[in-house]
């Protein structure tokens, strides 16, 4: 997509880039999006995610459409390059983008429409896709050890400069030794679980440059308001936790305390909000 807009925070208009195309040259259209949604939300696919349940026409409890459904009111094609997503309840743009749009995967309709509905996830294409929309294609993988990629030379934004990538699946105890030996070239806390006790040792490696960027993930506490309806109790939990100490001691100062879902690096960050301070007595 090259733009997402909304006027009421329920109807989100997604415009697909005019140049976007699959690796076989077929244009990516709104039909790909709507058809992919139907297939992924099918009860025969039994997708483990429940994110589809927030959209109109999808069961809120299961996240599925009816078996054999040919359309869903919550995801419709406006024109060849425009799709409208309609949610059951209003949500902010950042919630739609980061919690839903980011996890919806569009597939090539002209490929998957030839695969039986209940056989999608076990099909050869699904597990070894040779028609893709991104810069890389999977060439090989071992679920417990690695996944290998080759550049998509027909990528509509231009072929990647790195021809091949091999993503190793490591146990956290292997990260330090793999960096030390040069077995892996790069990693991050978002790619693998780097033990806190290894941070100083990794920073000391002569063959490794540690680069800290802006925070991109967060740790939050989610509370069932039906079980704890008193807002004062929920507020007390925030006052009782020394979040700055967690940043200073656990994250070595590489983080920030925020009252919200997005970091200061996000264009949706509201810098007018002052985070609640640690105050055990008030709690």
Q: What annotation goes with each model-predicted range?
A:
Residues 2-50, 78, 84, 178:
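Aromatic- and charge-enriched surface segment that lines or borders ligand/interaction sites
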Residues 5, 15, 50-114:
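Surface-exposed binding/hinge segments that line
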Residues 25-27, 32, 173-187, 231-235:
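Short helices/loops that flank or line small-molecule/ion binding pockets
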Residues 29-36, 82-86, 134-135, 163-164, ...:
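Alpha-helical secondary-structure segments
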Residues 86-91, 98-160, 164, 174, ...:
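Gly/Pro-rich hinge or "lid" segments in bacterial periplasmic/extracellular proteins
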Residues 152-198, 216:
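Ligand-site clamp/hinge motif
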Residues 196-211:
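Ligand-binding "clamshell"
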Residues 257-283:
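Structural transition elements
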